[in-house]
C-alpha cells in the first residue's frame, strides 16, 4: 500500500486552519491534528496558560517539538499555529514532510473571526488590529516561502475551501 501523504495547513490566526482542516480530513478519510490542541493535551493546560507561565519562547519550544513529532506521522491533515513558521526548524519539517497549503486571509476577516476569542494570548490587547497587522508584516514572508499552494479563505465557507484544496491537490 502506498504511503499516505500529509497536508499541512499554515496561515495566520483566524484563517480557518482548524475548521478547514477538520473538513479536509473528514472528506479524505485522514486523521486531523491541530498542533495547538496537541500541546494543550500534552501539557494539560491551555495555550494562554502556557504563554503566561513560560512566555512565548517557552511556548515556541513546545510547539517546535510538537511539530517535529506530528509531521513524522503519515496520512494526516495538520493545522499549525499562526506563529509556527517563525522557527526555521518548523519550516524545514513542514516543507520536507508534506504538502503545505497557506490559508490566506485579510486582517479584517481575522478580526471578525477572532474578536470574541479569549484563547488567543497575542490578541488580549486594546488594539488587536495593530497586533494582527504587525504579525502579518513579520510572518507573511514565511508563509509564502513554505507554501506549495495558497488558498484565499475570506469569502468562502470552510467546506468550499476544503473541496478546492482536494481538487487542487488531486487527491
Swiss-Prot record:
Q: Name one GO cellular component term.
A: cytosol
What's one Pfam family the UniProt record gives for this protein? SKI
Q: Which residues bind substrate?
A: 36, 60, 82, 139
Biological-process GO terms, alphabetical: amino acid biosynthetic process; aromatic amino acid family biosynthetic process; chorismate biosynthetic process
**Alphabetized UniProt keyword annotations:** Amino-acid biosynthesis, Aromatic amino acid biosynthesis, ATP-binding, Cytoplasm, Kinase, Magnesium, Metal-binding, Nucleotide-binding, Transferase
Which cofactor does the UniProt annotation name? Mg(2+)
Q: What is this protein called?
A: Shikimate kinase
Reactions catalysed, as given in the entry = shikimate + ATP = 3-phosphoshikimate + ADP + H(+)
Q: How does it assemble?
A: Monomer.
**Biological role:** Catalyzes the specific phosphorylation of the 3-hydroxyl group of shikimic acid using ATP as a cosubstrate.
Q: Where does ATP bind?
A: 14-19, 120, 156
Alphabetical list of SUPFAM superfamilies matching this protein? P-loop containing nucleoside triphosphate hydrolases (SSF52540)
Is the keyword Methyltransferase assigned to this protein?
no
Family annotation (HAMAP family): Shikimate_kinase (MF_00109)
Q: Which family does it belong to?
A: Belongs to the shikimate kinase family.
Sorted alphabetically, which Gene3D superfamilies does this protein's record hold?
P-loop containing nucleotide triphosphate hydrolases (3.40.50.300)
InterPro entries on file: P-loop_NTPase, Shikimate/glucono_kinase, Shikimate_kinase/TSH1, Shikimate_kinase_CS
Pathway(s) annotated for this protein in UniProt: Metabolic intermediate biosynthesis; chorismate biosynthesis; chorismate from D-erythrose 4-phosphate and phosphoenolpyruvate: step 5/7
Cell compartments where the protein resides = Cytoplasm
How the cofactor is bound: the record states: Binds 1 Mg(2+) ion per subunit.
Return the broad EC class.
Answer: transferase
* EC id: 2.7.1.71
Organism of origin is Psychromonas ingrahamii (strain DSM 17664 / CCUG 51855 / 37)
Matches recorded under PROSITE patterns: SHIKIMATE_KINASE
Q: Which GO terms describe its molecular function?
A: ATP binding; magnesium ion binding; shikimate kinase activity
Amino acid at each position: 500500500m502506498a504511503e499516505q501523504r500529509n497536508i499541512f495547513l499554515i496561515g495566520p490566526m483566524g484563517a480557518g486552519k482548524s475548521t478547514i482542516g477538520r473538513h479536509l480530513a473528514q472528506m479524505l478519510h485522514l486523521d486531523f491534528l491541530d498542533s495547538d490542541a496537541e500541546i494543550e493535551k500534552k501539557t494539560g493546560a491551555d495555550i494562554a496558560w502556557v504563554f503566561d507561565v513560560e512566555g512565548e519562547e517557552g511556548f515556541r519550544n513546545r510547539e517546535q517539538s510538537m511539530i517535529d513529532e506530528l509531521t513524522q506521522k503519515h496520512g494526516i491533515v495538520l493545522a499549525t499555529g499562526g506563529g509556527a513558521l517563525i522557527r526555521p526548524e518548523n519550516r524545514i519539517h513542514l516543507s520536507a514532510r508534506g504538502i503545505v497549503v497557506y490559508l490566506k486571509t485579510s486582517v479584517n476577516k481575522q478580526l471578525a473571526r477572532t474578536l470574541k476569542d479569549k484563547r488567543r494570548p497575542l490578541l488580549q490587547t486594546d488594539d488587536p488590529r495593530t497586533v494582527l497587522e504587525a504579525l502579518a508584516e513579520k510572518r507573511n514572508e514565511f508563509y509564502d516561502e513554505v507554501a506549495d499552494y495558497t488558498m484565499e479563505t475570506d469569502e468562502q465557507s470552510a467546506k468550499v475551501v476544503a473541496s478546492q484544496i482536494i481538487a487542487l491537490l488531486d487527491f
